[in-house]
Amino acid sequence: MERVLIVNADDFGLSKGQNYGIVEAYRNGVVTSTTALVNGEAIDHAAQLSRELPALGVGMHFVLTLGKPVSEMPGLTRDGLLGKWIWQMAEEDTLPLDEIAHELACQYQRFIDVFGREPTHLDSHHHVHMFPQIFPIVALFAAQRGIALRIDRQTVLNADDLPSDLRSTQGFSSEFYGEEITEACFLRILDASAHRGEASLEVMCHPAFVDNIIRQSAYCYPRLTELEVLTSASLKAAIAERGYRPGSFLDI
């Protein structure tokens, strides 16, 4: 059975170092897709690079935890900025869901304005779209527009509640992250997916060159390690040997 493998690099637009790392991993590695933060400091640079790479799938990385929102969000921001206090608000069930739905629509329009096309799919920074309160908003938004959505099926409480016309991969992995970033780790993810009989799989990654913006991230130098592994010739060969076809969310 042919299986579609989407290797999606998150954080396109975060910084020039991030952008260049993603492009390197696409041109000379196994990355096939990326998702962009429309409020990132280097989003215009990302859009410029993407115009030179029309086959690179570019989706939208919905942001509710970093930088300035596109719309006014007094119920979520502090001093005009987004931040990780969203987790506490989710636990307390005090999220401003109307503001979040409006911000999603505004970020989507910003993406179209910057990239000149609709995104191939949606996911989110720090997986906030998988919060139980936010997921229905994003899932309905994606289904109405006919675009795919990253779904961590281990997190969805009731898969039966998903819109019937919502597109996603059968499998998703965020395990290529952290301290163990190796070719062996990547291949274990593929083998586990194949064992489950999944016809499509998304593997999340964050390849980057380190610059001043990336240095401020809690996840910094491992991004360089990811880049090294993802551009390995042996990894590309091992993926092909396992019968995976590289693809984007337009292929599912």
UniProtKB/Swiss-Prot annotation:
Mg(2+) binds at H61, H125. GO terms for biological process: chitin catabolic process; diacetylchitobiose catabolic process; polysaccharide catabolic process. It catalyses: N,N'-diacetylchitobiose + H2O = N-acetyl-beta-D-glucosaminyl-(1->4)-D-glucosamine + acetate; diacetylchitobiose-6'-phosphate + H2O = N'-monoacetylchitobiose-6'-phosphate + acetate. Pathway: Glycan degradation; chitin degradation. One of its GO terms (cellular component) is cytoplasm. Its cofactor is Mg(2+). GO terms for molecular function: chitin disaccharide deacetylase activity; deacetylase activity; metal ion binding. Disulfide bonds: none annotated. SUPFAM superfamilies: Glycoside hydrolase/deacetylase. It is found in: Cytoplasm. Involved in the degradation of chitin. ChbG is essential for growth on the acetylated chitooligosaccharides chitobiose and chitotriose but is dispensable for growth on cellobiose and chitosan dimer, the deacetylated form of chitobiose. Deacetylation of chitobiose-6-P and chitotriose-6-P is necessary for both the activation of the chb promoter by the regulatory protein ChbR and the hydrolysis of phosphorylated beta-glucosides by the phospho-beta-glucosidase ChbF. Homodimer. This is Chitooligosaccharide deacetylase. It comes from Salmonella heidelberg (strain SL476).
